[in-house]
């Protein structure tokens, strides 16, 4: 079941789904528009950048998510960016995830100016039949509690900690 706007608002009020930097103006009937925080192009970070044609770039979100153990997030590039030739590749946001997101995009079109605060992707929250037996923070937690642009697993995550032991 996809969560509607009133359910999203109620859950956000309870400290779930989007725990920091929620903006009611980004709420949609069945989801939420995620906003650009930092832009990473070739390892350098910007708050505003003209993304050229055939350029891969990363974006961190302003929003900090707190996904409950019985919800999954699904993300799509906003159609206004897709029409300009910007495409993204995203996985599901696992039940139990907490942190901001680092999203990967590619510009196949003409140069596009991108700036902090711009709405670039939509997240839809889907209620699972029940809670995950092993939510993200227990199963792996590679990017749990991430902040900013994150390319590698967050130090201190369960898998990163176990890798150091071996």
From Swiss-Prot:
- State which gene encodes it: dcd
Q: Which InterPro entries match?
A: dCTP_deaminase (IPR011962), dUTPase-like_sf (IPR036157), dUTPase_trimeric (IPR033704)
Q: One MF term from GO for this chain? A: nucleotide binding
Source domain of life: Archaea
Enzyme class, first EC level, given as a word? hydrolase
Q: Where does dCTP bind?
A: 78-83, 94, 122, 136
- Gene3D superfamilies recorded: 2.70.40.10
Q: How does it assemble?
A: Homotrimer.
Please give the name of this protein: dCTP deaminase
User: Pathway of this protein?
Assistant: Pyrimidine metabolism; dUMP biosynthesis; dUMP from dCTP (dUTP route): step 1/2
Summary of the function given for this chain in its UniProt record = Catalyzes the deamination of dCTP to dUTP.
The record lists the catalysed reaction(s) as: dCTP + H2O + H(+) = dUTP + NH4(+)
Q: Which family does it belong to?
A: Belongs to the dCTP deaminase family.
Question: What EC number(s) has UniProt assigned to this enzyme?
Answer: 3.5.4.13
Please report the organism this UniProt entry assigns to the protein: Thermoplasma acidophilum (strain ATCC 25905 / DSM 1728 / JCM 9062 / NBRC 15155 / AMRC-C165)
| GO BP field | dUMP biosynthetic process; dUTP biosynthetic process
Which Pfam families did the record assign? DCD
Which keywords annotate this record? Hydrolase, Nucleotide metabolism, Nucleotide-binding
């Amino acid at each position: 079941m996809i969560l509607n706007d009133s359910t999203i608002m109620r859950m956000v009020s309870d400290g779930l789904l989007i725990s920091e930097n929620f903006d009611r103006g980004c709420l949609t009937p069945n989801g939420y528009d995620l906003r650009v925080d930092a832009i990473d192009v070739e390892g350098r970070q910007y708050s505003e950048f003209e993304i050229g044609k055939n350029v891969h770039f990363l974006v961190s979100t302003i929003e900090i998510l707190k996904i409950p153990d019985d919800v999954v997030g699904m993300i799509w590039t906003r159609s206004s960016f897709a029409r300009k030739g910007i495409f993204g590749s995203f996985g599901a946001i696992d039940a139990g995830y907490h942190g901001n997101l680092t999203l990967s995009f590619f510009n196949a079109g003409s140069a596009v100016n991108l700036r902090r605060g711009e709405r670039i992707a939509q997240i839809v929250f889907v209620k699972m039949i029940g809670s995950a037996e092993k939510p993200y923070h227990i199963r792996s937690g590679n990017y749990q509690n991430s902040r900013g642009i994150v390319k590698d697993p967050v130090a201190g995550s369960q898998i990163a900690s176990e890798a150091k032991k071996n």
